[in-house]
Amino acid sequence: MAGRGGRVLLALCAALVAGGWLLTAEAQEPGAPAAGMRRRRRLQQEDGISFEYHRYPELREALVSVWLQCTAISRIYTVGRSFEGRELLVIELSDNPGVHEPGEPEFKYIGNMHGNEAVGRELLIFLAQYLCNEYQKGNETIVNLIHSTRIHIMPSLNPDGFEKAASQPGELKDWFVGRSNAQGIDLNRNFPDLDRIVYVNEKEGGPNNHLLKNLKKIVDQNSKLAPETKAVIHWIMDIPFVLSANLHGGDLVANYPYDETRSGTAHEYSSCPDDAIFQSLARAYSSFNPVMSDPNRPPCRKNDDDSSFVDGTTNGGAWYSVPGGMQDFNYLSSNCFEITVELSCEKFPPEETLKSYWEDNKNSLISYLEQIHRGVKGFVRDLQGNPIANATISVDGIDHDVTSAKDGDYWRLLAPGNYKLTASAPGYLAITKKVAVPFSPAVGVDFELESFSERKEEEKEELMEWWKMMSETLNF
């Protein structure tokens, strides 16, 4: 993954150096703006942010520009390719890019899953530019975030669909053309339907998390999954993400799990075990967006049913049922909590409105990112201080566990309250601790687990000591 991303980066950088900022011929696609148009874009920036639509070559150029400006805290990599061969590019921002630092949580933003929903794509490009600019200015909030969080930003999960939508004239950009990938697959209905599995497990007993454990090969062999879907599944499996948001368009609301209803009906509040923290996470986004959180905002369209919306948030199933969505897949296949944010009534609004969308969402994007530092965090180790990977962290009263990463580090998002946490692992004695969780920051709770073999040896030594004492006392 990283090697291929490195080769792409070297090629892009060579082209940038040779041509000032132009891309290679490989990046010039049919329908892409001419060089003169790209130069116009370079001139139309405000505080380092270009409030214009970025076609695929320009998206690559924008990410490379951020990397060239902030090489010490960023890197570009790809998680795979779209059906038509475009790279699914990610820019990472961290004080140690490319490395998972033990104890540091991992965050991701994904945009443009539906190719014709363009605002999220642009906001994530703007966000990368903003984080780089503000870090260099010494903005304390941004510096602290980048030093304490590994941030991954994927502006476009569906670059093929976006190119198709962007090539349409006028209003045809908006509602239909380019929504699906180049195969005609709706990516947000294409993930393994883990909701149906967990709903059965709720009734009959069974796992409540990591429902795709050790099934990567099956994912690769599933011909019904789009290449974009497979790439993201591997990404989710490979990196210990804690928090995520998937940016869409077509309405104004922050949507939280579950997306698919339990009964199969079209509309039904479908709470997940972490309903309390998910409501709080959704509000952390919506409350900083003045339009999204406005209780008097009229529906985007006359016949829209926004009755499930509360403070700019909604439970997914209460709004409308979505089987096979990426949001619930994150929650049920990994440790990652994800919400879906609808950013705009129009899916592909006029270019001149992009600046106002950025102004409405900038604080929300930062606020949501900060939520990763809530709940409980820590390490699970053995008595010798060695990390225990894949240890289970259970919360009494919440039927959804998380697991420790390879360094024994774990993160458990929780709403404020008093909890009992239990750490367990095969071959070890479980330990339970009580913890009072504030709104923020995350409380550190470490666990040291004793192995069964160590306990047996300890019991043997205690027995020998007892026998020695009895022998000395009774003189035999």
Curated annotation (Swiss-Prot):
Glycan-modified residues: 139, 390
Organism: Mus musculus (Mouse)
Propeptide: 28-42
Residues of the signal peptide: 1-27
Single GO molecular function: cell adhesion molecule binding
Compartmental location: Cytoplasmic vesicle, Secretory vesicle; Cytoplasmic vesicle, Secretory vesicle membrane; Secreted
UniProt name for this protein: Carboxypeptidase E
Reaction(s) catalysed by this chain's protein: Release of C-terminal arginine or lysine residues from polypeptides
Lineage per the UniProt record: Eukaryota, Metazoa, Chordata, Craniata, Vertebrata
Gene3D superfamilies named in the record: Carboxypeptidase-like, regulatory domain, Zn peptidases
